[in-house]
Amino acid sequence: MRIGILSDTHSLLRPEVLPLLAGSDHILHLGDVGDPEILGKLAAIAPVTAIRGNIDTHGPCAKLPETEIVTLAGPYPEVAFYLLHDVHQLDLDPTAAGFSAVLYGHSHKPEIRHHKGVLYFNPGSCGPRRFQLPITCGQIVIDKNGQIEAKILTLPIQQ
């Protein structure tokens, strides 16, 4: 299973991200959507699960949940992802809760790390550039044994 992951679009869905998400079985947006039409465009590619970020507290995106649990099963052992916008607001023990991964955004800084057997993954931002950070999104591939491989995908953008 292939999962496309993005965050911090801030009302800008760059056309360069769409080919990177093509072929995804599911897409996760980790908050700061901005324009809800972005979710519709993503849904044309694959089913979408989205959460609200700190810029989504008013308007149509305010209806998005603050956190979400996504459980996926297939020809592999079940995997469970915990989605939240800001990892500093994590108020549970992901290992004790049985999560395979904690997926988050907010900082615009891509990150892949493991702690106590749990993947912590921030795809970075594929919206407006912040400081000198790269423009990125992410991908998770789950193999037939339930192993999770996370990748940061850099968009081909110079400016």
Listing of model-derived features with the role each one plays in the protein:
Residues S11, D35, H88, K109, ...:
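Short active-site segment of divalent metal-dependent hydrolases/proteases
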Residues T49-Q89, A96-G98:
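Helix-adjacent hinge/juxtasegments
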Residues V87, D91-A97, V102-E111, H115:
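Non-DNA-binding regulatory cores of transcription-related proteins
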Residues I69-P77, A97, H114, F121-Q159:
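Binuclear metal-dependent phosphoesterase catalytic core
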Residues T57-H58, P110-I112, R129:
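Short gly/pro/ser/thr-enriched loop/turn and capping motifs at secondary-structure boundaries
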Residues M1, D25, A46, V79, ...:
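A structural micro-motif
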Residues M1-V48, D56-P65, T71, L133-T136, ...:
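N-terminal active-site segment of His-dependent metallophosphoesterases
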Residues I5-S7, H26-D32, T49-N54, Y82-H85, ...:
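Active-site neighborhood of phospho(di)ester-bond hydrolases with catalytic His/Asp-centered motifs
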